[in-house]
Amino acid sequence: MAVLDLALQGLAIFGCVLFFVLWFMHFLSIVYTRLHLNKKVSDKQPYSKLPGVSLLKPLKGVDPNLINNLETFFELDYPKFEILLCVQDLDDPAVDVCKKLLGKYPSVDAKLFIGGKKVGINPKINNLMPGYEVAKYDLIWICDSGIKVKPDTLTDMANQMTEKVGLVHGLPYVADRQGFAATLEQVYFGTSHPRSYISANVTGFKCVTGMSCLMRKEVLDQAGGLIAFAQYIAEDYFMAKAIADRGWKFSMATQVAMQNSGCYSISQFQSRMIRWAKLRINMLPATIICEPISECFVASLIIGWAAHHIFRWDIMVFFMCHCLAWFIFDYIQLRGVQGGPLNFSKLDYAVAWFIRESMTIYIFLSALWDPTISWRTGRYRLRCGGTAEEILDV
């Protein structure tokens, strides 16, 4: 009995520690969002002396928003940049979209590369290789096809690239769109994701997604260039790690990386979350423990049990109150990331929040069950450490 009592006491202490850690993350991310995101910062260098930037744009297929998203890059207000559009297949409809924009903006330094270069299993790296090899500026901006920008987005990112910074990244968020699936995505990228993303970066953990990353080409070349990351599916994580390992700091842009895909659904969102969870589990095995207990419902149960064991509080009353507080703080976080009025009602938020939180265990168990992922046109079997092998159809 003494051993059991000691174990229960240890679990109760763990629940208390979990409570303080998770609420520290809540407060930290909200304060950072209010102080840093969507703020106009003073220019750290004259406009005319901003460094040149080579934009690498990987393209695969089209969606209803692709041409509008791409056009925002042709309309950037920046003194010196080039756009390197990379398409894998000649018959890809994205080729026609690119040619249309190249004809519409002849004064913009932009080129189209078709065919890619096979250097590994990562299709995004393979697609970008021709553009990377001819990039002429010291800064490389890799930005996904579903991202849209403002005219001053690149200026904001370049101003964050100070002397000791090697990588500038944008917090992923989602543009206002119609439909419940869009609301669900917006709630996730405005609550759970920024809480972990911001907390990790502020406390010194390198957490970067590759949707919009500005990097020093010299540092990437020292790490072996893009080809060195072609063995990984999550190339963004390993690029960031390589830059950090060489002593460079990271900085987060004040503007978010605004996702604006024209194709979205609840099933697509769920599949994307499962794919990301699989990658995290294989790259960082500690995720198996940390991720489930950081979600609202599981954390509330653990902390509620600890409160009952130590203080004899009612578990269900504590669970409901804790979830309500989490729900409210998530809404505050969402409004901060949005930087303005939301495109949906508080009722829509409540429903989307509950469904998103209810999905978490299913997403996590699905990720554990099957180590293979489908991404772009291929299927891959993940290995521990982040590498992968392509599954070829026989």
From Swiss-Prot:
Pfam families for this protein: Glyco_transf_21 (PF13506)
One GO-annotated biological process of the protein: glycosphingolipid catabolic process
Record-stated family: Belongs to the glycosyltransferase 2 family.
Motif (Q/R)XXRW mapped to chain: 272-276
Catalytic activity as recorded in UniProt: an N-acylsphing-4-enine + UDP-alpha-D-glucose = a beta-D-glucosyl-(1<->1')-N-acylsphing-4-enine + UDP + H(+); UDP-alpha-D-xylose + an N-acylsphing-4-enine = a beta-D-xylosyl-(1<->1')-N-acylsphing-4-enine + UDP + H(+); N-(9Z-octadecenoyl)-sphing-4-enine + UDP-alpha-D-xylose = beta-D-xylosyl-(1<->1')-N-(9Z-octadecenoyl)-sphing-4-enine + UDP + H(+)
Enzyme Commission number: 2.4.1.80
Intervals of motif D2: 144
Lineage: Eukaryota, Metazoa, Chordata, Craniata, Vertebrata
The organism's place on the tree of life at top rank: Eukaryota
Species, as recorded: Xenopus tropicalis
Designated name of the protein: Ceramide glucosyltransferase
Residue ranges annotated as motif D3: 236
GO cellular component, one term: Golgi membrane
Record topology, Lumenal segments: 1-10, 216-287, 329-348
Purpose of the protein: Participates in the initial step of the glucosylceramide-based glycosphingolipid/GSL synthetic pathway at the cytosolic surface of the Golgi. Catalyzes the transfer of glucose from UDP-glucose to ceramide to produce glucosylceramide/GlcCer (such as beta-D-glucosyl-(1<->1')-N-acylsphing-4-enine). Glucosylceramide is the core component of glycosphingolipids/GSLs, amphipathic molecules consisting of a ceramide lipid moiety embedded in the outer leaflet of the membrane, linked to one of hundreds of different externally oriented oligosaccharide structures.
Keywords, in A-Z order: Developmental protein, Glycosyltransferase, Golgi apparatus, Lipid biosynthesis, Lipid metabolism, Membrane, Sphingolipid metabolism, Transferase, Transmembrane, Transmembrane helix
Pathway note: Lipid metabolism; sphingolipid metabolism
Residue numbers on the Cytoplasmic membrane side: 33-195, 305-309, 370-394
Residue spans crossing the bilayer: 11-32, 196-215, 288-304, 310-328, 349-369
